[in-house]
Amino acid sequence: MAKLEKYNEKRDFEKTAEPKGAEKKRKAKKLHYVVQHHLARRDHYDFRLEWDGVLLSWAIPKGPSFNPADKRLAIRVEDHPFDYKDFEGTIPKGEYGGGTVMLWDEGYWEPIADVEVGLEEGSLKFEIFGERLKGK
């Protein structure tokens, strides 16, 4: 549960419909990924990769690009529960992340290099296979 401690501390589950933080380790042949458009105080996109029972998460202020040459700032945020990949809805105003969350893309991903080392170094290498986004 320690992986989701920050996630749970920031939310009042009596007020938000977001899924409560619980790790969900599964024997998956394919690792899920999701991009959610988050119309919060600042419009941005959330990029999430399934890993070790949670969704590793980054905020992308300018949103994804279809051009592989484009660089995008990705700000690491707290891990989210696996069930968050299906979350769409409105987080109440005044709550952490208040605003509307909409699914923008989903699919699966494959690591190209060691994920734990990449997280430590701040550079993950992977390929995604989504409905909108595809590539390395």
Give the residues covered by each predicted segment.
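A charge-rich, low-complexity, intrinsically flexible signal that marks solvent-exposed coils, linkers
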Residues: 1-136
